[in-house]
Amino acid sequence: VIDVGTRLAAPFCAGLLGEMGAEVIKVEQPAGGDFMRTIGPFEDGYSLFWAVEGRGRRSATLDLRRSRGQDLFRQLAAHADVICENFRPGTMEEWHIGPADLDPRLVLVRISVFGQNGPKAQRPGLDRMGIGYGGLMYLTGYPDSPPVRPGVTVSDYLTGAFCAQAAVAALYARDARGRGTGAVIDASLYGSILRILEWTIAAYDRLGIVRQREGNRLPNSAPLDNYPTADGRYICIVAGSDANFARLCRAMDRLELTEDPRFTTLAQRAANADVINGIVAEWTAPRNATEIEATCVAADVPVASAYTVADIVSDEQVSARGDVVTVEDPVLGPVRQQAPFPRMVGAPPVVPSGAPCLGEHNREIWCDLVGLSEDELAGLAAEGIV
């Protein structure tokens, strides 16, 4: 897999393929490398974002804006199965490394904000444009407040994940199903968001409903909210169904609520959501989060604390499943990070190699794989091509 992308979406796709077992080669500009290397937080000037999302691949530098660099890229591509890119549409063609210039057996993953065609295709943009035009930003937040972005770059990650799935399917069709040719996967950041909008488009089409922000609640379920606790935390309780509501009432020692005509059915509880959520909040407010969670777990009520990262890395479930691994970074040494996900039962755990230094593997890639001599590589370095 050749990762010729920048920032996050295409590199994340390549990284997922690497965590499935692919060999990934990161191709970066000689001056500075991937922009991801410049994004904080930093430890002694070194990007921790890069330490996570640059892992599991080798780094080779190459100036794709110059004809010799383009020629070398085509030579490298002859060894590849998949190429992942997220340049503005037309850039690969301008550099003579687009689909028409490459082996048709390649699977070319192309990610951009708006896709390769359409009236907005040439606009610049990042994750924020994806969640904006995809409709997620409008739906995120509280009804009486402006739209807000989700806590992480959802459209970049989601598009990368969808594209990794598509790349594997394309390889399967090429090899196992005998198609013989690869595929061009054309993905937009906003399109990945559209795909997870649940019933939003269908309800607008059939009922004229324009879905609005709902905060932590759902319009057709209650009690359901993030409730305050005595120790300044928030805890999510989901007890919309009749069975879960009865269990919660028993846990709160408020069984009489199950007979209250305002709460006897799901529809009635949803219609009186402010009231029932207020009752639950009154129960949680004087109690600590751990006490509330233990009580709900004992009663078989769905519950979750709103975890900070400190909670995550110390949680016994995370530890038991190996969801945080220690990656040996070439600059920082051991760094705890998210483990590859998902995992196959019975397969040995995968611990990715650390994110490479810029051009760390130039000799391996350009000499051992592509076939340049040491003198040729030195000449290219002197010219700034690598």
Give the residues covered by each predicted segment.
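Oxidoreductase and adenylate-handling cofactor-binding alpha/beta cores
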Residues: G160-A183, R195-L207, C249-R254
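A glycine-rich dinucleotide-binding beta-alpha-beta segment and adjacent secondary-structure elements
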Residues: A298-P352
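Short Gly/Pro-enriched turn/cap motifs at secondary-structure boundaries
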Residues: W50, E214-P219, D225-N226, L332-V335, ...
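Aromatic-enriched alpha-helical interface/lid elements that frame and gate functional surfaces
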Residues: P223-A299, V303
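N-terminal helix-loop segment corresponding to the beta1-alpha1 unit
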Residues: V1-R177, C357, R363-V386
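Flexible, small-/acidic-enriched active-site or ligand-binding loops
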Residues: V331-G379
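Conserved Rossmann-fold dehydrogenase catalytic segment
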Residues: Q116, D144-V154, D175-I193, Q212-P219, ...
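Glycine-rich beta-alpha junction loops
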Residues: A31, V113-G115, L189-L194, D231, ...
